[in-house]
A protein has these predicted regions:
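Conserved catalytic core of the tyrosine transesterase superfamily
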Residues: 1-173
Length: 173
């Protein structure tokens, strides 16, 4: 009507239309794959010799903390020795922008794994000041955690590329 000059201006010009964009949902780890990963890691833990047991305990503890807290890989890597209370299960995390927050682990079997890890690595933990340490007695870095996760998912026969952040999304659902 506007083009043929029957009306001066189309009334539709005053209507504002918003189209809702499709939102991609975050990727989560299916329960079966989490169970498969943890079962594999616990099996490896039971089969390891004493020398590698302390690092296997660390890896199991890291994965359990991921799933129990929904923490970011940066937050787990930077847990200080004095930021975790193994009796109460309270952990102080330093998040984005230096924001401090507390998370609670109430699962007693996870706390037992954390206590065993601490008992076998106490000297290295105290030396570094960080709760999760590498074989050189320093902080277990974010990149090392990512590589560890990749290694165990492959060993467990999981084809999906599982990232640390996927634990965060899985925790929230």
């Amino acid at each position: 009507l506007e083009e043929t000059e029957i009306i001066a201006e189309s009334p539709f010009r005053k209507i504002k239309v918003k189209f809702k964009e499709t939102v991609t949902l975050p990727r989560i780890i299916p329960r079966e794959e989490i169970e498969k990963l943890l079962n594999h890691m616990y099996q490896c833990l039971n089969e390891n010799d004493k020398a590698s047991r302390k690092f296997m305990l660390r890896d199991v503890a890291v994965i359990e903390v991921f799933f129990a807290t929904g923490a970011r890989v940066y937050e787990i890597s930077n847990i200080r020795d004095d930021s975790i209370n193994l009796n109460t299960g309270l952990i102080r995390l330093m998040g984005k922008g230096g924001k401090e927050r507390y998370v609670q682990i109430s699962n007693t079997s996870i706390l037992e794994v954390l206590k065993k890890y601490y008992d076998e690595n106490e000297q290295s933990i105290k030396k570094s000041g960080y709760f999760f340490v590498n074989n050189r007695e320093s902080r277990y870095t974010e990149q090392s955690i990512r590589l560890m996760l990749k290694k165990y998912t492959k060993q467990a026969g999981i084809e999906r590329n599982i990232t640390p952040h996927m634990f965060r999304h899985s925790f929230a659902t």
